[in-house]
Amino acid sequence: MSQPFFQFKQFTVWHDKCAMKVGTDGVLLGAWTPVESSARILDIGTGTGLVALMLAQRCSASVIALEIDGKAAQQAAENITRSPWGSRIEVVCQDFRLYSNKNNSLKYDTIVSNPPYFTDSLKCPDSQRNTARHNDNLSYEELLKGVSNLLSPNGTFTVVIPMDASDSFKDIASSQGLYPSRQLLVITKPGAPPKRTLISFTFIKQDCKEEKLLTEVARHRYSDEYIKLTREFYLKM
């Protein structure tokens, strides 16, 4: 049985009540997202609260951690309460579509999301895991429409998605007035094609700076670049 928690340098994330466990995608999102000068941050689909906690560690902003699943929201709240930044992070258990419609007068300097990524694929019997993994409950169109309503004029939206969804996601984003400014192609082993990508969007059209990140040079041997990006979080970096 896997361990029910993951210990980071400054906080612990319990994930035994959450469908999606602590993973590389979330760690990369929390470490790579630009947060300079951010006063207000929104984490869409916070799950365990991992990304919200990482961003709170990196800056002094207030953070809203939004989660549709009740059990995950409860565990995120518990993880956050035990952390050094409990007073700056608020967990809200609500559907993002409802939240964006009700709160469109609120604006966030930074919005992040590690959204469900399976489309039209076979589902498992676990409804909680389906919600976390399948985008039936929140399509990319709905996500980006809500983001465009809530992002401040000079704000940044950063997302982690499958590489094969990158072009279509950018097309949908541009229809909402959001344009890529940075993109990170994540390669898990030498010689392999990127399977994941992180993209930062703004309302400003500009050349997109593209980078590549190799996470492992061999099995269980992290690359120097990955260590540099995540060393403030992992215990053994």
Curated annotation (Swiss-Prot):
Coiled coil: none annotated. It comes from Bacteroides fragilis (strain YCH46). Signal peptide: none annotated. Its EC number is 2.1.1.223. GO terms for cellular component: cytoplasm. This is tRNA1(Val) (adenine(37)-N6)-methyltransferase. One of its GO terms (biological process) is methylation. Specifically methylates the adenine in position 37 of tRNA(1)(Val) (anticodon cmo5UAC). Pfam families: MTS. HAMAP family: tRNA_methyltr_YfiC (MF_01872). It catalyses: adenosine(37) in tRNA1(Val) + S-adenosyl-L-methionine = N(6)-methyladenosine(37) in tRNA1(Val) + S-adenosyl-L-homocysteine + H(+). Belongs to the methyltransferase superfamily. tRNA (adenine-N(6)-)-methyltransferase family. Gene3D superfamilies: Vaccinia Virus protein VP39 (3.40.50.150). InterPro entries: DNA_methylase_N6_adenine_CS, SAM-dependent_MTases_sf, Small_mtfrase_dom, tRNA_Adenine-N(6)_MTase, tRNA_adenine-N6_MeTrfase. Keywords: Cytoplasm, Methyltransferase, S-adenosyl-L-methionine, Transferase, tRNA processing. It is found in: Cytoplasm. One of its GO terms (molecular function) is nucleic acid binding.
